[in-house]
Amino acid sequence: GNETKEQLEALALDIVQYFGLGCRSTSKIFVPKGYDLNLIFGALYPYNSLMDSAKYANNYDYNKAVYLMSLFDLLDNGFFMLKEDASYTSPVACLHYEFYEDAQMLEKKLTEDNDLIQCITSNQNTTGHFAFGKAQQPQLWDYADGKNTLAFLNILT
């Protein structure tokens, strides 16, 4: 809730890089209750040229139509949607968000849901969390799903 403009811009990159389809793309954010979601839209705005891609635009139009026909509440800026949703996965051109009131309860939820989460980005210097803008830049030892792929392959030989 106290991110700088630069941190929000880096978060926006984590959201839209690879059209949001990267295995480590940010598909959901947790924000403090009362958070101004327009700050997220502001950080995303430089990526409005995504609509120049026919495939992205088709996904945006399709998902928006599905949401509107289903009478879901959503926030929309003309090229990207924010939807309050408990799911960790979101479709192209959409970011799920969830409000929280207690940071300790949020950490507990993230720990409990660890198997559903590929990676966590945050402005906190917390073990296992990546800085905003670094989700798609893992280190050699940042194995997918925390599983050491090389050790697994060695077992097979």
PLM region descriptions:
Residues 9, 15-157:
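NAD(P)-dependent aldehyde/semialdehyde dehydrogenase
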